[in-house]
Amino acid sequence: VIPAKRRKIPIFHMEAGNRCFDFRVPEEINRRIVDHVSDINMPYSSIARGYLLAEGFPADRIIKTGSPMYEVLHYYMPKIKASDVLARLKLEEEKYFVVSAHREENIDSERNFNGLIETLKMLDEEYGLPVIFSTHPRTRKKIEEKAIKLSESIRLMKPFGFIDYVHLQMHAKATLS
């Protein structure tokens, strides 16, 4: 965004104003920089708009757009419904969990990572259902480095594509992210 701004190219920032208020999260720093150099900020929610206003952005540089996810899901819903991912993974509707965890603050923090692993083990013990754990490379590396042994019902899977992942979420007992 900075090279574009230096070339006087107008910057319109979708997802503007999103905040987690944790500067250890790289995305938080990026969000704030991009918001501040953008000509127009387009937050999805009134909450995000409020954060921008509280930071001193003029109201005429903020256009609340709403989330595009409704349109995206509506457009892809026929393909999502047609996904055969449950059959490929031998899963039954409402009889499995979906888990995704890859954020730096959850994987690189020993406390948070250990809490995640304990949660997976408790989920397995309490429900006895398959846990489809979409493991990003940093997550898989950490599990391997620590030589963590998980039950066979906790399946470490490569990240799924959008269509299959939404289908999994729609039919899971619950999604943990």
Model-predicted regions and their roles:
Residues F21-P26, L73-H74, D164-L168:
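Short, charged, surface-exposed secondary-structure boundary motifs
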Residues V34-N112:
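A nucleotide-sugar donor-handling region in carbohydrate enzymes
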Residues K81-K173:
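Donor-nucleotide binding loops and adjacent catalytic segments primarily
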